[in-house]
């Protein structure tokens, strides 16, 4: 099995586990065990080293700590793809990059349309711009060979650029008041990591030691701690067939797929439908997120792909029809983990009462987009 096959198989399993974890969280959130679920996520955990102590509830250890490892993996995958993967050929960059940009712009505009007159609500404009690569590839994989491999590659490339956009959005728009001392320490640790690469250090343990120090500095700086994972990834050496980057990526992938993302989904997807009424479904935040994911994503991605002459040649070469492209555009509306994550950042310092609305919008929008995308692909794709 080559690396591509292994990657897609893992993402398939990851998508299934995410679905199970999310459904389990929703079931518990609507059962008598809801109180225990909330209590479990609110348990404080502390880590102390000398005079330094960090205390956070379990939910934030997952969102700030474990998700930094997920972003480290994203960074490693992006670096690998740029160095020697689907993004290494610059002619392959334009279509997925501009498509991802359009797939970001349309959902954001829909969200802004519904929430323009609510300054606090408006802070969630980026929630429907995300695409969950594990969920989307998991859905596509259920159709097996019906979906051309080139479409899976295109979907992956769009999702990678989507992740890059999410990283930029978090850094620019969801950063708290900054601590110059902590930022300075973060810069020092970043320079040390760059130096380790430059002087040919190839011990993962040394990189991870300074990586943890960088994460703590970023956590204390006001910049979201998950971005430390991206910075660490960019400093990891990628030389030779069995490079340090490859070894670290392979080592992390299973942990992320089998533990971190399912745990994140379980901790964040617990939507309670008790007392749900039409007024909640028509809340501006719910409409902005749900319609942004379902309508915004499909409009942005399908219209932009249909525009490129270069892409039309690609369609003919691989016998891909526009209906299949439309199915892929729909599936890109499955924002799930990334949308929930951005939602937790958007309102954490303003109005936590909006989080149930975020969860309802993300769950409904992602479910409808994923289901309709699956049905469109199933009806328009022949077995190969």
UniProtKB/Swiss-Prot annotation:
Asked if Flavoprotein is a keyword of the record, the answer is no
Q: Which InterPro entries match?
A: Na/H_antiporter_dom_sf, NhaA
Q: Which GO terms describe its cellular component?
A: plasma membrane
Record's keyword annotation contains Transport? yes
The cross-references to Pfam families, in alphabetical order and at most eight, read:
Na_H_antiport_1 (PF06965)
Q: How does it sit in the membrane?
A: Multi-pass membrane protein
Its biological purpose is as follows: Na(+)/H(+) antiporter that extrudes sodium in exchange for external protons.
**Protein's name according to its UniProt entry:** Na(+)/H(+) antiporter NhaA
Q: Which gene encodes it?
A: nhaA
């Amino acid at each position: 099995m080559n690396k591509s096959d292994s990657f897609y198989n893992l993402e398939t399993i990851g998508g299934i586990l995410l679905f199970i974890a999310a459904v389990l969280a929703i079931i518990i959130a609507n059962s008598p065990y809801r109180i225990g679920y909330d209590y479990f996520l609110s348990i404080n955990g502390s880590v102390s080293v000398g005079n330094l102590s960090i205390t956070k509830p379990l939910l934030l250890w997952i969102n700030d700590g474990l998700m930094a490892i997920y972003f480290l993996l994203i960074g490693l995958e992006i670096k690998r793809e740029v160095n020697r993967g689907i993004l290494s050929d610059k002619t392959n960059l334009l279509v997925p990059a501009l498509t991802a940009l359009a797939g970001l712009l349309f959902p954001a505009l829909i969200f802004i349309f519904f929430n323009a007159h609510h300054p606090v609500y408006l802070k969630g404009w980026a929630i429907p711009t995300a695409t969950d690569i594990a969920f989307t590839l998991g859905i596509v994989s259920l159709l097996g060979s019906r979906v051309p491999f080139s479409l899976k590659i295109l979907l992956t490339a769009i999702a990678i650029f989507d992740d890059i956009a999410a990283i930029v959005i978090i850094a620019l728009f969801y950063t708290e008041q900054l601590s110059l001392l902590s930022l300075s320490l973060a810069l020092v640790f970043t320079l040390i990591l760059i130096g380790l690469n430059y002087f040919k250090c190839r011990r993962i343990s040394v990189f991870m030691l300074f990586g943890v120090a960088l994460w703590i500095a970023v956590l204390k700086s006001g910049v979201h701690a998950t971005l430390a994972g991206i910075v660490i990834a960019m400093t990891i050496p990628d030389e030779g067939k069995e490079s340090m980057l490859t070894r670290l990526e392979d080592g992390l992938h299973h942990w992320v797929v089998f533990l971190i993302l399912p745990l994140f989904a379980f901790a964040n997807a617990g939507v309670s439908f008790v007392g749900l009424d039409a007024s909640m479904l028509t809340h501006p935040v719910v409409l902005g997120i749900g319609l942004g994911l379902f309508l915004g994503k499909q409009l942005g991605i399908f219209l932009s792909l249909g525009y490129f002459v270069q892409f039309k040649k690609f369609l003919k070469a691989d016998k891909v029809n526009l209906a299949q492209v439309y199915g892929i555009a729909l599936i890109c509306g499955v924002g799930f983990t990334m949308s929930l994550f951005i939602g937790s950042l958007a309102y954490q310092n303003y109005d936590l009462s909006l989080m149930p609305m975020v969860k309802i919008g993300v769950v409904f929008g992602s479910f409808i987009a994923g289901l309709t995308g699956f049905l469109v692909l199933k009806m328009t794709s022949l077995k190969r």
